[in-house]
Curated annotation (Swiss-Prot):
Location in or out of the cell: Cell membrane
Active site: 175 (nucleophile)
A GO BP entry: pyrimidine ribonucleotide biosynthetic process
This enzyme's EC code(s): 1.3.5.2
Source organism phylogeny: Bacteria, Pseudomonadati, Pseudomonadota, Gammaproteobacteria, Alteromonadales
Family from the record: Belongs to the dihydroorotate dehydrogenase family. Type 2 subfamily.
Protein name: Dihydroorotate dehydrogenase (quinone)
Keywords: Cell membrane, Flavoprotein, FMN, Membrane, Oxidoreductase, Pyrimidine biosynthesis
Gene Ontology CC entries for this record: cytoplasm; plasma membrane
Gene: pyrD
Record InterPro entries: Aldolase_TIM (IPR013785), DHO_dehydrogenase (IPR050074), Dihydroorotate_DH_1_2 (IPR012135), Dihydroorotate_DH_2 (IPR005719), Dihydroorotate_DH_cat (IPR005720), Dihydroorotate_DH_CS (IPR001295)
Keyword Thylakoid listed: no
Length: 339
């Protein structure tokens, strides 16, 4: 009931202003008595993923809490993990406003945020300050003004700084809103990046006597051949996990709607089938060697179950969480326990 009232108010506001207000409110209430307005008890449904044990298979996707400001609040809601970021080595403002659009009839969102964040040093401070022991993944990317050819340096800088504070690290090369970023998904650039990241992971594991798993987040706009090539690169470089998928550049299912022609990545219900298809293809290519987090268009427990059936070990929600609220977490966990 509380979420429906809050949502009604928020949906009258500019989407980015509403988002910032929500994150700010959650930051202030996350670990105090006011979190009773959204906290919920969820029956544990432990799942093993990348050598880690999560209390349940439902996580918050990257992009919601870029700077790790409201982690404790999302823990109170019952998420099994939170993925913060995307974070870059240096702070950056992101793309020009407006850059976030609701497509309410389709339960969808278009964004062209452009990795707006306060930088990796600020994120680390927030990770240290969090009060709860929730599993936190850190999604890392490159700064907009870093040439693609030097992009791996940005990922390595972020790895160095977040390594001791992350349950796992997610490598984002699939956002459509940073020029040239998706080119890192192909050919020599992909192999060079994954090789460098794996070498850095092993170096840090030896230095700190702690192994932090690494996952790669991929786009939904890939051919089967491109998916096969990514799978082979993941296996070759001994990555620990994959996250499928990011937002799509397609506009299937939103034609004619207000804001449908805005540039950026489309998320939400129109992405459901495409994301599930990519998960299934990726799982087939990986042959059980590397586990997958399924994300993209999960608007119901049934959508999540389809991701599990396609080969995902865990799932993440974002747009569906905005449209459905925290109850979606509980519904998915209950369905998972019964499957």
């Amino acid at each position: 009931m509380f979420y429906k009232i809050a949502q009604k108010v928020m949906f009258q506001m500019d989407p980015e202003r509403a988002h910032n207000l929500a994150i700010g409110s959650l930051r202030m209430t996350g670990n105090g008595p006011l979190n009773a307005f959204y906290a919920q008890n969820i029956t544990p449904a432990p799942v093993s993923f990348m050598g880690l044990t999560f209390p349940n298979p439902v996580g918050l996707a990257a992009g919601m809490d870029k700077d790790g400001e409201s982690i404790d609040a999302f823990h109170a809601m019952g998420f099994g993990h939170v993925e913060v970021g995307t974070v870059t080595p240096r702070p950056q403002p992101g793309n020009d406003l407006p850059r976030l659009f609701r497509l309410k009839p389709a339960k969808a969102i278009i964004n062209r945020m452009g990795f707006n964040n306060k930088g990796v040093d600020n994120l680390v401070k927030n990770l240290i300050a969090k009060k709860t022991d929730i599993m936190v993944g850190v999604n890392i990317g490159k700064n907009k003004d870093t040439p693609v050819e030097q992009g791996k340096d940005d990922y390595l800088i972020c790895m160095d700084k977040v390594y001791l504070h992350a349950a796992y690290i997610a490598v984002n090369i699939s956002s459509p809103n940073t020029p040239g970023l998706r080119s890192l998904q192909y050919g020599d650039l992909l192999d060079e990046l994954l090789s460098a990241i794996k070498a850095k992971q092993l170096e840090l594991a030896d230095k700190h006597k702690k192994y932090v798993p690494i996952a790669l987040k991929i786009a939904p706009d890939l051919t089967i051949e491109e998916i096969e090539n990514i799978a082979q690169a993941l296996i070759k470089n001994q990555f620990d996990g994959a996250i499928a998928t990011n937002t799509t550049l397609t506009r299937d299912g939103v034609s004619g709607l207000a804001n449908a022609n805005e540039s950026g990545g489309l998320s939400g219900k129109p992405l459901t089938e495409l994301s599930t298809k990519v998960i299934k293809q990726l799982a087939t290519c990986l042959q059980g060697q590397i586990p997958i987090i399924g994300v993209g268009g999960i608007n119901s427990a049934e959508d999540a179950l389809a991701k599990f059936d396609a080969g995902a070990t865990m799932v993440q929600i974002y747009s569906g969480f905005i449209y459905q609220g925290p109850k979606l977490i509980k519904e998915i966990v209950e369905a998972y326990r019964l499957k």
